[in-house]
Structures are given as C-alpha cells and as structure tokens.
C-alpha cells in the first residue's frame, strides 16, 4: 500500500480541488457547442446528476466565444458551476476561452502541432519546435494568470505529435515528454 499523498489545493471557480477536499465529479458534454440551448440543458442535467464541473469542447474561436453564452444560460437557470473548455489544435480558441471559463484543458500533443507521420527532426529542428510551442503557450499562460483561470494539461496516446512519436514512439515516456 502506498502512503497517502496530500496534494496542493487548486481553486477552480467556487470549488477547491486537492488537499483534504472531497474528490470532485466532472463530466463532459457531447452537444454541439454552437447549440447553446442544448449545451446549457445538458449541463443542467449533468449538475442534477451530481456533476460539480462540466467540460465543454471548444474546437474553434466561435465555440470558445459561445462559452460565455453557455455560462450566462447556466447562471440564468441558477447554476454557477465551473466550466472547463476542452481545446484541441487551436491555441487562439484556448486564449479566448481562458477569459471566459474557470479552467482550460489543453493537450500538449495537439495544442499547436498536428501529427504528420514520417517526419524526422534533427536535434536543431526539434529544439526549434519546442521553442515554437513555448511561444504559442505564453499568451495563454498570461491570459490565465490575469483571469485566475486554471490550466489542466491532459495528454493521451491518441494525440502525440510527430515530434514526440518520432523520438519516443507511442510510449509512456512520449506522453511525459509531450
């Protein structure tokens, strides 16, 4: 048996995660984020089922902006739960969402680069890619800092970049390095 590890506390909207706080329940909508009413209704059903936070996909800037309308619709229905924006492939959508929601989930494997099989990078090109990714991430970090928005880094095997796949393969090390 492993000793119990007490993590630090993270504030997500009106909820605290970690420390001695209870495990929090989160789910994700499957509605089209452009359908505001359907997404608000699904969020309300999730809250009524016990969710304390709801994740909503924001594939583009339009969907990221719609998060404000979803948040407003939830507030009108008496639900002020933390919303989480789920972002893939679109750093600008993440930046827009970070000014609206309480938490942004990004995947480093597809935040700013897509998978292109067969690409092998030299050490110099690999390091240039890392710097390019860092440059794309800095504006998001600044917006999150200004708004008190939490960032969740979520990685999985299905979204490792070419840079990672060619260096580490589809391995746990690749997920960590991602």
Briefly describe each language-model feature range.
Residues 2-56, 61-83, 87-178:
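Alpha/beta enzyme core
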């Amino acid at each position: 048996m492993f000793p119990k590890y007490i993590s630090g506390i993270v504030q997500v909207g009106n909820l605290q995660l970690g420390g001695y706080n209870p495990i929090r329940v989160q789910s994700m909508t499957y509605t089209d984020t452009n359908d505001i009413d359907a997404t608000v209704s699904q969020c309300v059903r999730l809250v009524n089922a016990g969710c304390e936070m709801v994740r909503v996909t924001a594939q583009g800037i339009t969907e990221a902006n719609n998060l404000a309308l979803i948040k407003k619709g939830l507030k009108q229905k008496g639900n002020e739960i933390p919303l989480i924006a789920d972002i893939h492939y679109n750093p600008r959508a993440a930046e827009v969402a970070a000014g609206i929601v309480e938490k942004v989930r990004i995947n480093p494997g597809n935040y700013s680069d897509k998978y292109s099989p067969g690409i092998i990078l030299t050490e110099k090109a690999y390091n240039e890619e890392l710097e390019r990714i860092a440059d794309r991430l800095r504006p998001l970090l600044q917006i999150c800092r200004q708004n008190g928005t939490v960032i969740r880094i979520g990685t999985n095997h299905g979204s490792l970049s070419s840079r990672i796949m060619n260096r580490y393969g589809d391995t746990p090390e690749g997920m960590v390095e991602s």
